């Protein structure tokens, strides 16, 4: 599953993990993506969307 929000387009962030001895290895931080059933428009069809939790908390979708 792609780690991209269907509403805001938030995707993974990239960076380095740094150990105690300062060795650096690449890593990525994925957003908290949840699959939800949402109504596309009032009285419309339900659709399955991949949405980040910040969009769910902000009320950017109507769950159905």
Swiss-Prot record:
Protein name as catalogued: Large ribosomal subunit protein bL28C
One annotated GO biological process: translation
Family: Belongs to the bacterial ribosomal protein bL28 family.
The encoding gene: rpmB3
Record PANTHER family: 50S RIBOSOMAL PROTEIN L28, LARGE RIBOSOMAL SUBUNIT PROTEIN BL28A
A GO term for molecular function: structural constituent of ribosome
Pfam families: Ribosomal_L28
Gene3D superfamilies: Ribosomal protein L28/L24
HAMAP family: Ribosomal_bL28
Residue pairs linked by disulfide bridges in the UniProt entry: none
GO annotation, cellular component aspect: ribonucleoprotein complex; ribosome
Annotated keywords: Ribonucleoprotein, Ribosomal protein
Species name: Mycobacterium tuberculosis (strain ATCC 25618 / H37Rv)
């Amino acid at each position: 599953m792609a780690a991209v929000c269907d509403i805001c387009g938030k995707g993974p962030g990239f960076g380095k993990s740094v150990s105690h001895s300062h060795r650096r290895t690449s890593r990525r931080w994925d957003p908290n993506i949840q699959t939800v059933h949402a109504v596309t428009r009032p009285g419309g069809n339900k659709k399955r969307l991949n949405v980040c939790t910040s969009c769910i908390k902000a009320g950017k979708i109507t769950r159905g």
